[in-house]
From Swiss-Prot:
This is Flagellar L-ring protein. A lipid is attached at C19 (S-diacylglycerol cysteine). GO terms for molecular function: cytoskeletal motor activity. One of its GO terms (biological process) is bacterial-type flagellum-dependent cell motility. It comes from Pseudomonas entomophila (strain L48).
Length: 231
């Protein structure tokens, strides 16, 4: 019996551990700044006024377009969702079976325990009702800015960017991460682009410390609101 209780306790601990949200770790290599590759110096052409690799177009702007360049993304995300669902199932059934004769004779027989005659009539009835209601409402707002680096320039000119920002506060750390694809035409003259213009965006806002822990339910609350709760 003790071994069985130990197995149940261990299984419950494992299930509760699976309900805990993973804590983001700093210095993720995926979000590390991508540095530009250093090209080999072009061979100097003695006697030439114009040297290869030192040219600059008169119409070139200062917007990021190479690997390792920096872009500032302004965060302006607002999402809201609401869902209501209701269901009701009801079933009633009833049946009566009556025999007027059995092999040509009346089915009533004398009751040996007294009272009226015994009858071969039978019947049943049943009712079943199932009802459920659910409602979910969620809203999120994220504003601010984060400066990221160009990780890759695709053949069609689309720029892949990613980066993160960690802020150490008195009670913990705050994390903002973003990765996605940006069109060069969407980059403003001040080298900024709104987050609503980032395609395939992966935005993470999380943190560690006492404030982050206070917003998480306890281990017993997570058990009661988990799908494992039978009621």
């Amino acid at each position: 019996m003790k071994h069985l209780l130990s197995v149940f306790a261990l299984g419950g601990a494992v299930l509760l551990a699976g309900c805990v949200a993973p804590t983001p770790k700093p210095n993720d290599p995926y979000y590390a700044p991508v540095l530009p590759r250093t090209p080999l110096p072009a061979a100097a052409n003695n006697g030439s006024i114009y040297q290869a690799g030192f040219e600059q177009s008169l119409y070139t702007d200062r917007k990021a377009f190479r690997v390792g360049d920096i872009i500032t993304i302004t965060l302006n995300e607002r999402t809201s969702a609401s869902k209501n669902a209701g269901s009701q199932i009801q079933k009633n059934s009833k049946a009566d079976i009556g025999l007027t004769s059995l092999f040509g004779s009346s089915p009533n027989t004398n009751n040996p325990f007294g009272g009226g005659d015994l009858s071969l009539e039978a019947g049943y009835s049943g009712d079943r009702t199932t009802k459920g209601d659910s409602k979910a409402t969620q809203g999120n707002t994220l504003t601010g800015s984060i400066t990221v680096t160009v990780a890759e320039v695709l053949p069609n000119g689309i720029i892949a960017v990613r980066g993160e920002k960690w802020m150490t506060l008195n009670t913990g750390e705050e994390l903002v991460r973003i990765a996605g694809l940006v069109r060069a035409d969407d980059i403003a003259t001040d080298n900024t682009v709104p987050s609503t213009r980032v395609a395939d965006a992966r935005i993470t806002y999380s943190g560690t410390g006492s404030f982050a822990d206070a917003s998480q339910p306890g281990w017993l609350d997570r058990f009661f609101i988990s799908p494992l709760w039978p009621f």
